[in-house]
Structures are given as structure tokens and as C-alpha cells.
Amino acid sequence: MTNKALLVVSFGTSYKETREKNIEHIEKILARKFPDRKFFHAYTSGMILKKLRERDHIIIPNVKEAMEDIVKEGFTDLLVQPTHIMNGVENDLMKADVLSFREHFSSLSFGAPLLTDTSDLFYVIDALTKELPALSEQEALVFMGHGSTHYANMLYGALDYAFKQTGHPHVYVGTVEAYPDLDAVLSLMEGKGYRHVYLAPLMLVAGDHASNDLAGEDEDSWKSIFQSRGYEATCILKGLGEYESICELYVRHALQAQPV
């Protein structure tokens, strides 16, 4: 029996279809990449775990519960790969939970979240622009990130800048819960002559934020706000976990995991 384990940690989603297309998709790819490690997974969102348990009778462990199982089964070599987008609050809390079990492992390594250094920005830009529609001068593509009060939130502005630096002037990045917000994006787009806007989530899953805050029919959704300003709006409800090239970056981070 191997003494090696792989723990894949996600924020989670209560949407079955997008869970299968994104989180479980990445989990399967990572599990296949590390056949010498027993696979474990965990979600960090207590609200989502509670909803899955009570509504769907699906039991997924949180990080501490998964770690207890890993220790109980006697594994001493652990690789942890998060599917988080950035090194934000969720990733910090996840690492703290894992490290509280450090004494049980002879080897413990963490892979990086999706966007960790500058090379990740350019990799993701290349991956997404190959997958998404080519834009005319009258078309724009707007990504909705989650956003955070954590200092790592600055990566969204860096990503927007990097899109433009790499020859994609009609691509914009905003967030639903922080800065740059939709108002900031709209101000940058003003006077550019755009008629048609593509809207896409910059999130692992196309879940609640994508379905409601981005593409919902309420007047305060991004789609509705763009339409109210005279733009034609098309929503691309596809989580990042559906893109094979994005999954490959998570694999790369896992292969380059840093020991602690």
C-alpha cells in the first residue's frame, strides 16, 4: 500500500452540472496524473457543504475532516492542490487547516492556486483567448471575477493590464464583490464604440455568481446593466474548470508543489 496521498481542495458549488463539469473534471485529471497517490477531496465553503448535505444528501468533507481521514488511514506523504483562483482568504484558511496536522507527515507539499505569479497571468490569457470568440472593433469581452478584500485581489487589475499589453485591448476584467467593480469596467469602456459585449465568469465554476450576478434577469445583473446601456449582451456560462488548458496549469502547479 502506498503511503502517498493527494488532497484536492475547492471552494465548492451546489450546482450539480457545473460541479461535474468543473470541480470533478479537475479532480479526475489530477487523480490520473498522480496514480501513485490515493485521492481525497475537500470543500472550504461551509454554506455549500451544508446545502449539499441537507438538500442532496451529498457528504463532502471540509479540509479538517479530510485531513483526519488521511491521517487515520496512515498516509505520511501528502500533496495538497487547491483549485482556488488566487492566494486569497480561502487559500490561507485551507493551508492553516492542513498545517495543523503537519506533525503527522514526513512530507507535505502545497501546489499553487491558478494565478500565483506573472507567468500564470500570461498562460491564462493565452488559454482563454484561444477558446473564446475573436472580437471585432465593436465587440468587447468582460470577465467577472469574484473579488476579495484580501491583498491578492490586486491580481484582477494586473490581469486586465496584461490582457491589453498582450494585444487584447477589448478584454476587461471586473469583480462582483471588490475592485475593479462593474462601474470601473463601464468607465473604461465608455466612448470606445462597443455595441456587443460578451460576458464570462473568471471563476472555477459557472455557479451562483455566473447564473445570477452575471447572467440573471434581475435589473442589477451585469447582463441587464449592459443591456440597459444599449449594449447587446451575450453570456458565456462556462467555468474555468471546463477548459483543458486551465486544468493543465493546475497540474503544472501540482507537479511544482513546494514542501513545507
Mark where each language-model region is:
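Active-site-proximal alpha-helix that buttresses catalytic centers in soluble enzyme cores
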Residues: 1-260
